[in-house]
Amino acid sequence: MSPNAMPQDSQANVDIMSVITRGTSWQWMLLLGLALLGVAQAAATLAYQTYVGLGIAGYQAPVFWAVYIVTFVFWIGIGHAGTLISAILFLFRAKWRNAINRSAEAMTVFAVLTAALFPLIHIGRLWKFYFLIPYPNQRGLWVNFKSPLLWDVFAVNTYMTISIVFFFVGLIPDFAIARDRTTGIRKFIYTILALGWQGKSGQWKAHNRTVLHLSGLATPLVLSVHSVVSWDFAMSIVPGWHATIFAPYFVAGAVFGGFAMVMVVMIPVRRIYGLEEYITDYHLENMSRFILFTSNICGYAYAMEYFIAWYSGVEFEQTSFWLRAFGPYWISTWCMIVFNVIFPQLLWFKKLRTNIPFLFVLCFFINIGMWFERYVIIITSLSREFIPAAWGLYIPSLAELSVLTGSFCWFSMFFLLFLKGGPIIAMVEVKELIIHEKAHGGAH
């Protein structure tokens, strides 16, 4: 974008704050209503499940990790793109991240909050959740550190804590701008959230130092958290799971699906609120390149899984992967391959990388494909283990599908509320970019 096309830095405050200050549209109210309805029906399902038991969730031998665990892994993965954009690209000084990092950070926090529900849902007895916390107690019981469920508790809570702190610290200067441009109860709330920010040089030094340290802390978390989640499976001897490739495979898939979800969220927001001057085609094209890159990594991992199963000569592994492609779950497997590997290859063409409707549709299907990837990994391996007499056919129950739908509504509810409560674009960072671009006459 040329400097002449850039808005004035003062205009950036007006444009971005207008998303918050303008009245709520009927479209926003409709979407929020649908999201609340979805959350309500999922809550009703969970209440009934808690009363009756996990039997209504379709759990039956040999599949006792099902849609709830699939969806947990999916949402944890979605949360990784925000940290990648905000932390890793910040450390690499990639300026194009400035316009999209806030949306990505918000998505990260809300995705992790969604994922955190599923270990609790999976244990069935919600009121016993504190048994997962290692603390001295009169019962003489201690947590089982060999349990993948406990690994997930530590991974999710660590990642959620860092993500929320990182998200909030970045919002402080923008809360101060919102404080000075609103009145009434909104001004009161923003005043509290701004923590006395006045934009003094000392505050900026402390803020920049904090963001830098949090970025350095969050970067290894991107790699470690989903690696820990992948070890839920890789540490077992179940055919199709016991593989050393799982950690990098899961991390690449998480970034891939996370970037696709950022696009699905950002493209409508950009269009509806007229933010094309800030979230430009240049940003979307750069994200498309990341999606293409991580898609190819996932494709390589898929191919290597099948190759190693063949090369190993282990009959159980070969049978497991044969059944994935041609067994009762073949539709899920081929949806995964087509949506995650074949369709993204169209991004080699620049015309398609800059075609906004195409990007939205593609990223929507990528997220479907990434959910199917987790479904294929978990369900197919558990339903066809070592003993043929113990094989079974798993079919998701209505209760699981209800909670799955509710998780997307839960995520959407948070994001819609944030649209009207917090700046969806980091105003301070965008203004820095505008000033820098006008001074140097270069694209960002």
Q: What is the meaning of each model-derived region?
A:
Residues 19-21, 26-48, 137-336, 349, ...:
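Long, contiguous internal "core" modules enriched in hydrophobic/ aromatic residues
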Residues 63-127:
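Membrane helical hairpin/interfacial module
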Residues 103-110, 276-299, 358-369, 431-439:
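Interfacial and helix-entry/exit segments of alpha-helical transmembrane bundles
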Residues 2-10, 340-344, 350-444:
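TerminUS-proximal long segments
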Residues 81-93, 159-176, 261-271, 341-357, ...:
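Transmembrane alpha-helical segments in integral membrane proteins
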Residues 1-78, 412-416, 443-444:
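N-terminal signal-anchor module of multipass membrane proteins
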